[in-house]
Amino acid sequence: ATYANILEDRFRKSGIMHLMAVSGGHFVLLAGLVRRLGRWLLMDRRLTAVMIASMYVLLAAAMFPGDSVTRALIMGMMGAASHAMGRRSQALSALCWTVVGVLVVSPGMSTSYGFALSSAAVLGIVLFAGRLSRVLGHVLPHSLAEMMAMTIAAQLFTLPIQVLMEPELPLLSVPANLLVAPFVGLSTITGLMSLALAWCMPWLAGVFAWVSSWGTLVMERVAMWLGSNEMATLPWKDGVVGAALILLAELGIGALSVLVTRQVKRVRQPEAGLPGMRFGSVWRVRLTLWIEESRRLLSGDSS
């Protein structure tokens, strides 16, 4: 029990607590696996949708019931229905209908931190993950940019809620999520395969569980390493005031980013009637000319 409590605390401080709970990512991975199988077998999309919905129900039944599982299951069912009708799934619409429907049927869910965190994370990913990925893609590899964008987008929308639960900010959540991201998908799929085969093929289930354990070992090592760092968290004001402060800080950073982006676009606009862009828009040119002028000045060459 002591080790479990310490591990949970380290996961929370390192910002990867979501890995210890069933989330929408598990449902997405399972749906992707079923879709690939359906395409390989040339199955009708309606039959594939039925299989996806069935897998969703089995996964939800096998997991410990939770508010995040409820949200993921309902959204997954909407996605399966869209697939059956041949329509592209609309995550934002599905999320809105899910939240409204759940709150109408069960108003008590409005006080659930798990449901709020799950919904906020999905909202952040849907709205901003793509944009952040394109921005980060200019300086990072595509896969790394996507992982970082999803982490940042989810963190931005869940931080105000996290502050209500625990008055501290996880400063190392982005590097922690980047370190474990390559292993999450593999561990999830092999873990689910182990669960599905345990009743009929225990030996093969053991192999899948062993493979999955290597991924979870990486997560445990990252959590213990980063979560034990004194710089892992930053104390913050608690309560509604703390949530409002972090929300204002995020809005301020967002407004500053928009202003800087607009300024850069304005500077990079081509001059009317002239080829190319303004001189100040290319930092490499400025740096090269500065180096050349400095070298000429120091060498005493006035020609």
Give names to the regions the model predicted.
Residues 4-173, 238-298:
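Hydrophobic alpha-helical transmembrane segments in multi-pass membrane proteins
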Residues 125-231:
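Alpha-helical transmembrane segments of multi-pass integral membrane proteins
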Residues 301-303:
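Intrinsically disordered terminal tails
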Residues 119, 208, 213-217, 221-256:
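Membrane-embedded alpha-helical segments of integral membrane proteins
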